[in-house]
Amino acid sequence: MALSKLNHLYMAVVADHSKRPHHHGQLDGVEAVQLNNPTCGDVISLTVKFDEDKIEDIAFAGNGCTISTASSSMMTDAVIGKSKEEALALADIFSEMVQGQENPAQKELGEAELLAGVAKFPQRIKCSTLAWNALKEAIKRSANAQHLTDQNVKEGKNV
């Protein structure tokens, strides 16, 4: 009986994130990372505002299934205020978790840990990881842009 109530609570939290997602929308003045899941049609546009190494603000828009939208919402809650390195570590922990690998650090995912059950549904793994993959791409692009800026400064070019 207790397990049934716990599962119901988990499902309610996931449904709430899907129906009323946190950090939904687009941020002005930052490049959007757009990814899609051709298997089911989920599409995400992720915008991230960095303050040097920290994620200052983050938002997502797009169309997706319940799992994709809830995961996107939970991801934004988990990574805001984190360093790029911390956010990448969380993305890796999440990816491993939804593939069935247990990790004590899963607790750091916050409510996103509730999506561990996705591992039982392999066809939904891509739905759950779409936003996390977009986050990895945004961090990669940010690092590349910073490298180019640093290189131009080193070479004495105007940026």
From Swiss-Prot:
A single GO molecular-function term is: iron-sulfur cluster binding
Annotated residues for binding of Zn(2+): 40, 42, 65, 127
- Which cofactors go with this protein? Zn(2+)
Which InterPro entries does the record associate with it? NIF_FeS_clus_asmbl_NifU_N
Q: What keywords is this UniProt entry annotated with?
A: Metal-binding, Zinc
Cofactor binding comment, as recorded: Binds 1 Zn(2+) ion; this is probably a substitute for Fe-S centers.
Q: Name one GO biological process term.
A: iron-sulfur cluster assembly
User: Quaternary state and partners of this protein?
Assistant: Forms a heterotetramer with IscS; each subunit of the IscS dimer contacts an IscU monomer.
Q: Which PANTHER family match?
A: IRON-SULFUR CLUSTER ASSEMBLY ENZYME NIFU HOMOLOG
Function, in words: A scaffold on which IscS assembles Fe-S clusters. Subsequently gives the nascent cluster to other proteins. It is likely that Fe-S cluster coordination is flexible as the role of this complex is to build and then hand off Fe-S clusters.
Name the family: Belongs to the NifU family.
According to UniProt, the name of this protein is Iron-sulfur cluster assembly scaffold protein IscU
Q: Which gene encodes it?
A: iscU
